[in-house]
UniProtKB/Swiss-Prot annotation:
One of its GO terms (molecular function) is dioxygenase activity. Its cofactor is Fe(2+). Fe cation binds at residues 219, 221, 275. Keywords: Dioxygenase, Iron, Metal-binding, NAD, Oxidoreductase, Plant defense. Converts salicylic acid (SA) to 2,3-dihydroxybenzoic acid (2,3-DHBA). Negative regulator of defense against Hyaloperonospora arabidopsidis. The keyword Iron applies. It is an enzyme of class 1 (oxidoreductase). Belongs to the iron/ascorbate-dependent oxidoreductase family. Coiled coil: none annotated. Its EC number is 1.14.11.-, 1.14.13.-. This is Protein DMR6-LIKE OXYGENASE 2. It comes from Arabidopsis thaliana (Mouse-ear cress).
Amino acid sequence: MAASKLLVSDIASVVDHVPSNYVRPVSDRPKMSEVQTSGDSIPLIDLHDLHGPNRADIINQFAHACSSCGFFQIKNHGVPEETIKKMMNAAREFFRQSESERVKHYSADTKKTTRLSTSFNVSKEKVSNWRDFLRLHCYPIEDFINEWPSTPISFREVTAEYATSVRALVLTLLEAISESLGLAKDRVSNTIGKHGQHMAINYYPRCPQPELTYGLPGHKDANLITVLLQDEVSGLQVFKDGKWIAVNPVPNTFIVNLGDQMQVISNEKYKSVLHRAVVNSDMERISIPTFYCPSEDAVISPAQELINEEEDSPAIYRNFTYAEYFEKFWDTAFDTESCIDSFKASTA
């Protein structure tokens, strides 16, 4: 019965053990006893005075967070609390619909701009992950909203409101990060073409043997910057200083992490960061990452201002289109933590 189901959320409801296709090799399991709790190791940036007299100090906080960690939390971010609450409720309601209603949106085609799927890339990977996800393209919203799920009833309206609000936040973050690199505040934004914005609503059902599998294994994000909304259940872990650190949810904050495109544009002044999602046997978990990215035709390369051959700061990466990078990212199916090395400039 379980084998015929498309989604792990429907498999989880009928099994008391992890099916063999979800079991990781012994050498690649979470080892939760070795995981540390974040404490103060993940920076928290208060954006309240970003546009006030303390801007320079906050920009310095961005520089420190991006260069030392690549992961940080933000508060006073401007996304209304009610908007966040409605988005999380809509996400829960979507995954609590009947199996027949949910699978209407199922597709394994990674090029589809709206799709429900499972794991990461089921057509390529060797071991499945304990995750279902609804992926939505959402900028420009008018190009995609009519293909989003129409149920629950308020889903499109709520998601559009959330996506619009988070995009405004991202544009503010990009200005701050650009300034923190010593660049004009619009430099990074102008590098990524017409811009792209995707969302994933990740659903991690309860798992009978969480020590055997992952929600998502260790990976780095392909995009420019990710803004993550978590529910109250812990599951995100970041690799820092040779250890996995659990990033426990903090109310009214977002988690922000840099992706591979920021690593390229900054010429490795800033780096994308390895992270993963683990599951548990007690509670389902929902996370909603917003992936902000270049448009597919955007040509990505290190910012010229950050290249100086005479001071031993050559361009580390060659020019490439984001479409080329994104296709490579999906094809790896997380067999590697990142595909960024294949885009390095030739040293021959």
